[in-house]
């Protein structure tokens, strides 16, 4: 009986958050261990389906860097990085699109469908959703930046009561152009702004933003975040994550969260509990 009462209490505790975020768009950047562990994949799908069933509008933007690197190695295609960003030749671009659109995107859609949510997978090329431009073609090739976003196709998916699953590949207006490989964190941030999302969450392989003693910082303002970057507390791979958070917040998103995707049901814990499990950044 006690277990049953605990279940009811948990549901009641979540009720204020369900009411608060009902009918709100929530962008989730999906990557890291949560994207490679079979158990965590299932839990992620369950979390998204539950959020969708209680009236929220989750939008998934996924990466796939490790899978891309593995397939490139298997095929004997050289790949290089500059400052942590992949140099995308035309041959690499073809494989990037194969992995992101043809493999990972479809796997996520299938997972969500299997757990009871209607999901529709697209890339930024579909419906003219994302238009790209070169980051620095001479050095980075087809690694790009987002020039323009037309949210109509994603809005239509949401209006059809489905979950959009987006591969971060941008199209071009040039006939025959292979498109652009877009950093998934950057894509998620820009998409959240364009779709007027309430929240954006980044699933990572760390607990969140850590202080110099390696303790989790649960809440930050933009100013505090910038200061932690300047003094070197935030460094390495966390820098582009917090930059993406800041860009989203300055574009009108209310809150940005960096959470540990290795924690069971981390999405639900962050959205439906008062304490959360990661770092929340806000204006």
Swiss-Prot record:
Protein's name according to its UniProt entry: Acetylglutamate kinase
Pathway field: Amino-acid biosynthesis; L-arginine biosynthesis; N(2)-acetyl-L-ornithine from L-glutamate: step 2/4
Entry superkingdom: Bacteria
E.C. number: 2.7.2.8
Family: Belongs to the acetylglutamate kinase family. ArgB subfamily.
Catalysed conversion reaction: N-acetyl-L-glutamate + ATP = N-acetyl-L-glutamyl 5-phosphate + ADP
Site (Transition state stabilizer): 29, 241
GO cellular component, one term: cytoplasm
Binding-site list for substrate: 64-65, 86, 181
Subcellular location: Cytoplasm
Major localisation: cytoplasm
Short name of any one Pfam family annotated for the protein: AA_kinase
Chain's role: Catalyzes the ATP-dependent phosphorylation of N-acetyl-L-glutamate.
Any one of the GO BP annotations: arginine biosynthetic process via ornithine
Protein species of origin: Sulfurovum sp. (strain NBC37-1)
GO molecular function: acetylglutamate kinase activity; ATP binding
Keywords, sorted A to Z: Amino-acid biosynthesis, Arginine biosynthesis, ATP-binding, Cytoplasm, Kinase, Nucleotide-binding, Transferase
Lineage per the UniProt record: Bacteria, Pseudomonadati, Campylobacterota, Epsilonproteobacteria, Campylobacterales
């Amino acid at each position: 009986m006690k277990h049953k009462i605990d279940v009811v209490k948990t549901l009641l505790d979540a009720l204020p958050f369900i009411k608060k975020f009902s009918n709100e768009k929530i962008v989730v950047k999906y990557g890291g261990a949560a994207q490679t562990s079979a158990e965590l994949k299932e839990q992620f799908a369950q979390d998204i389906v539950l959020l969708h069933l209680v009236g929220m509008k989750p939008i998934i933007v996924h990466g796939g860097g490790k899978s891309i690197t593995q397939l490139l190695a298997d095929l004997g295609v050289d790949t290089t990085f500059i400052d942590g960003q992949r140099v995308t030749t035309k041959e690499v671009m073809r494989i990037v699109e194969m992995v992101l659109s043809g493999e990972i995107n479809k796997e996520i859609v299938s997972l969500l469908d299997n757990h009871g949510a209607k999901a529709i997978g697209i890339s930024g090329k579909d419906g003219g959703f994302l238009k790209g431009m070169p980051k620095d073609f001479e050095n980075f090739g087809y690694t790009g930046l987002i020039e323009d976003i037309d949210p109509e196709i994603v809005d239509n998916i949401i209006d059809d009561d489905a979950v959009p699953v987006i591969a971060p590949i941008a199209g071009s207006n040039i006939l025959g152009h292979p498109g652009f490989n877009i950093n998934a964190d950057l894509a998620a941030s820009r998409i959240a702004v364009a779709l007027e999302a309430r929240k954006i969450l980044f699933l990572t392989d760390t607990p969140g933003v850590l202080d110099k003693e390696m303790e989790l910082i649960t809440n930050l303002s933009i100013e505090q975040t910038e200061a932690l970057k300047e003094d070197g507390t935030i460094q390495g791979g966390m820098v582009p994550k917090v930059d993406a958070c800041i860009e989203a917040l300055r574009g009108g998103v209310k809150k940005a969260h960096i959470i540990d995707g290795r924690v069971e049901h981390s999405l639900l814990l962050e959205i439906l509990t008062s304490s959360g499990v990661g770092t929340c950044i806000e204006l």
